[in-house]
Every structure is written in structure tokens, then in C-alpha cells.
Amino acid sequence: MPRITQEISYNCDYGDNTFNLAIDIGGTLAKVVFSPIHSNRLMFYTIETEKIDKFMELLHSIIKEHNNGCYRMTHIIATGGGAFKFYDLLYENFPQIKGISRFEEMEGLIHGLDFFIHEIPDEVFTYNDQDGERIIPTSSGTMDSKAIYPYLLVNIGSGVSILKVTEPNNFSRVGGSSLGGGTLWGLLSLITGAQTYDQMLDWAQEGDNSSVDMLVGDIYGTDYNKIGLKSSAIASSFGKVFQNRMTSNKSLENNENKLYSSHESIEKNNGQMFKNPDICKSLLFAISNNIGQIAYLQAKINNIQNIYFGGSYTRGHLTTMNTLSYAINFWSQGSKQAFFLKHEGYLGAMGAFLSASRHSSTKKTST
């Protein structure tokens, strides 16, 4: 089943009554944004990219339900890597379509983010565990538009792309990382056997990383005030795993004659002492802290204060957002700010949708 995100009320431009279906097919997730003709509603669906056949079925069901099955008046705009990888598959599945076009991925991300920043109330917010969620007014309201630029977009999907935006339509990719959502999802599915990303996030929310990570307090016994580190700060992600393994191995070597009566202890010493929720929280912290520090460094290099986090990595997950916010605040000593969005995973698809609305007469292409 697709994951449905809250719809938005917006006065869309329906042009010549073409039903625009904007899709963003990434390495992990496939997203779709559309607006039923004359509904003034934006709707958002997501499904795993590995279920690409189900995604094609989803697009068919959307056309049938929201455009009366009228394929000849339906235009698909594709962005993301899948716009190239699955381009032929799209044509095979939609031979009667009015048009299928591709939209440049990075441009789509920026157009989508600018739209959410300027046009959608209650979309952009800050978050940390102490202050909670704080909504940022749209620039068309009380926020000064000049205060928005320049900014960094840290788009976290399967990997991470960092874009510097100096003004509308003026941006450049300044960095990135291969350690992103795909890394978290891949390693946790391998280690814990979790079946879905949401399950991993649920486990992480209830986990205790202190049983897995080596903390500053484990080394110093207290805070390390000289460099501003609390005892709860992570000194080494997964640092206790190797330490406990070494202790377990020595215990087994010294008690070989007792193995026959210690089955439960053997299982525990072979790794069962580490609970899945604790492992999930530890790795979530490791990946998020790494992304946060890279984002801060790029913001420092480019002299930028505002950092927007997009992509499907956060999913409104409180621990993830708090970790990213903490990293930005800690490394910048409070001089830079992390921002989040309610529809963070749909920036590319939203940008593609807007491009079609502005050019609703696009013809069928074969490029």
C-alpha cells in the first residue's frame, strides 16, 4: 500500500485541463504529486521503488479515480534517477498518455522547496526536543523574502546532496555523501531484520543507544567540560559492541567446560544482548550526526546561516530532526539554523508538477 501524506489546499493552474502527474523515482522511494482537475488540492503518495510494478498500478489507479480514466488528457512529468531508468517502462505502461517528459532533478528540488517556503502556510518549521515544533511563517506573509537567501538544501534520500541556493533559479551542488537514508535502511535491515523503514524508525524512537554506543561518560566518568562535551555525548558509535564481544570471548575461553549448561548465556554473548531498538537508535544517531556535521561544514565554507533538510529520510521523525538540529546548533555554536518541512520527501516531485503547470502544452516526447 502507498504511504499517503497530508494533502494541501492550493489554487492550482489547470491550464488546458491537462491532468498533470508528477513523479520522482529515487533509489529507495517513488513519489507522486498531483491535483485532481478543478479541486484546488495537492495530493501526495509514496511507495518503495523496489515495488515499481505496484507504483505503475498506483499511477493507473490515480488516473482512473481522479481523471475519469482519461489517459489522452494526462501528462506525466518524471524526475529523479528513475526518470531515466524507468522511462521505457513508463511508455510501455501508458501508451495512450498525452505526454511523458523529464524534469532535471536538482532544479526540481529547488523549485519545490521555494514553493513550500513562499506559498504554503505551516509548512516550514524548526524542531528540537526542548522547544518542540515552531512553525515559520511563509515569506508571502510576515517573513522577509530577502532573509531567505542564500540557503543550503540538504536533500537526504538514499544518499545526500547539498545544494547552495543564492536566489530563485540560481543554485549549485556544493557537496554530498554516500552515507544517507539508504545506508541506514540497508544496515538496519541487515543487522536487525526489520522489514520497513517505518519499523526501524519506530524501534529507534523507543531505543537506548547507551547500551551500544561508547559515551563520553564511559571514558571520563563525567562531563568533559573543557571542550564542552556532556557525559551523554557519543564518543564512539557502536563502541560498546566490540568491547562486550571481547569480554564475552574471554568468558567463553575460561569456561569451556561449562558450555553444555550455559546455552542461554552463549546466545546472549553471541550478540543477543543488543536489542534491536537500541541498535536502530545508535545507527540513526551515527548517520544523522554525520549528515549534520557535513551540512554545518558546507554552511560555514559558503557563509550560509539557514539550512533546510529535505528528502524522505526524516519523515517527521522527532529523534531524527532533533539530532540534525542539535548537530547544527552544536557545531555552529547557535549561529546557524536547521529547518524542516511537512512534505520534505516531495520537493522534486513538487518542482516537476509546478514546471508542468507553467507549461501545460508540453507535447509527447521520446527523448
UniProtKB/Swiss-Prot annotation:
Present with 6190 molecules/cell in log phase SD medium. It catalyses: (R)-pantothenate + ATP = (R)-4'-phosphopantothenate + ADP + H(+). Changing G351S: Leads to thermo-sensitivity. Belongs to the type II pantothenate kinase family. Its main location: cytoplasm. SUPFAM superfamilies: Actin-like ATPase domain. Its EC number is 2.7.1.33. GO terms for biological process: coenzyme A biosynthetic process; ergosterol metabolic process. It is found in: Cytoplasm; Nucleus. It is an enzyme of class 2 (transferase). Pathway: Cofactor biosynthesis; coenzyme A biosynthesis; CoA from (R)-pantothenate: step 1/5. This is Pantothenate kinase CAB1. NCBIfam families: panK_eukar. GO terms for cellular component: cytoplasm; cytosol; nucleus. GO terms for molecular function: ATP binding; pantothenate kinase activity. Keywords: ATP-binding, Coenzyme A biosynthesis, Cytoplasm, Kinase, Nucleotide-binding, Nucleus, Transferase. CDD domains: ASKHA_NBD_PanK-II_Pank4 (cd24123). Plays a role in the physiological regulation of the intracellular CoA concentration.
